[in-house]
Amino acid sequence: MIPLLSAEQLRQADANTMAHEPIASIDLMERAATACANKLMETLACDVPVAVLVGMGNNGGDGVAMARILNMAGQPVRIIVPRYKPQGSPDFEANLGRARKDRIPVDFLEEGAELPAFTRGTLVIDALFGTGLQRPVTGWLKELVMALNQRPDPVLSIDLPSGLFVEVNAANDPEAIVQADRTFTLELPKLALLLAENARYAGEWEVVPIGLDREFIASLKTDAVVLEAADVAALMPVRNRYAHKGDFGHAWLLAGGEGKMGAALLAAKACLRSGAGLLTVHVPAGQDGVVHATLPEAMVSLDEDGTALAGLPKFEKVSAIGVGPGIGKADGTARMLKLLIQQAPAPLVIDADAINILAENKTWLAFLPEGTILTPHPKEFDRLAGKAANDHDRLMKAKELAVRLKAVV
């Protein structure tokens, strides 16, 4: 699992690495810049001009150091510094001095100045602001960001697109955030990069390791983590070479209705693909033919109703039950769902129309067995938990709902 740190925790991780490695802050900056420059040069043609737009803090220092490294590799590079305060951070100023000694062109923009024109095909590296930003970009700097976003030049952001906050962006100004084509985020993913509404800012992003103290990072308490394939693989039991289908559980799927058997088939295929040894699909009477023809490995149970599910099957040797895809919201189907969650003989996975039924009958949520899995898409979730103002708000509502229901959402 990869922890998703807050801005303050990211600062602590930097400070801890510097104190305990030990390494000076300017040397850690050099390490980060080298890692980003090397990653960029894996795909960047040697004749592509690069313009590095830097702020006067440590994210800007990363950008200046990166410009120096690219220059040493023979890349045509220039540095652009919007001078929004008299003095930059010590590490920024030190790197700027080194860049001048290397005779890298440096353009200072005084307040009110426009973004200079770039040679056609220039790659712009955005190193204005990093994870320490705590308020929206305003005034002249916002105008520069807006001008950059209107340019056709490709943009690579370092750590985060300038203007984007690490976690919550509800109070941010969407016009004051750089819209990058690509983002190199340092050491760890950031929560903001994982929210769909921020995709237009980050573009394609990837993590660039810079050697922070992972033991310290693992000791921090975080509200969110990213699951990796290895985390899931560790939960999968090793299959005995002499095992057979009866050793891997019997799943039941209550799905489908008149005109919606495709949903049942897709869910059934996914269930078998996930590793269930046996699968019985409960469908309306007369709808079994398509299941037999498409999934001969699945067994079929027939409901008494011919258009929608209206009753519970006689469950036999059931390990888990999925319900919802394509079932509709008829009164009889709703009654069936209520009985199921009240009498469930096995763990439940609730999806699609079953979630929509619960959204219209929220008092039934009290009947959900502990450990139930709910799999709504955003619209279904909003019906169930209330309309979310943004993706982060939806994430917080999902957390609250999961805790309240003792469920997985």
Ranges and model annotations:
Residues 121-123, 128-222:
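Internal gly/pro-rich beta-alpha loop/helix module
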Residues 96, 141-145, 180, 337, ...:
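Amphipathic alpha-helical segments in well-structured domains
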Residues 91, 136-137, 169-170, 385-389:
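Short, solvent-exposed loop/turn segments at secondary-structure boundaries
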Residues 105, 165, 392-394:
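Generic hydrophobic, helix-prone segments enriched in Leu/Val/Ile
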Residues 1-82, 89, 182, 188, ...:
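Small-residue (G/A/S/T)-rich helix-start motifs and N-terminal tracts that mark the onset
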Residues 65-149, 289-301, 309-317:
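N-terminal small/polar loop signature for handling phosphorylated ligands or for N-terminal nucleophile
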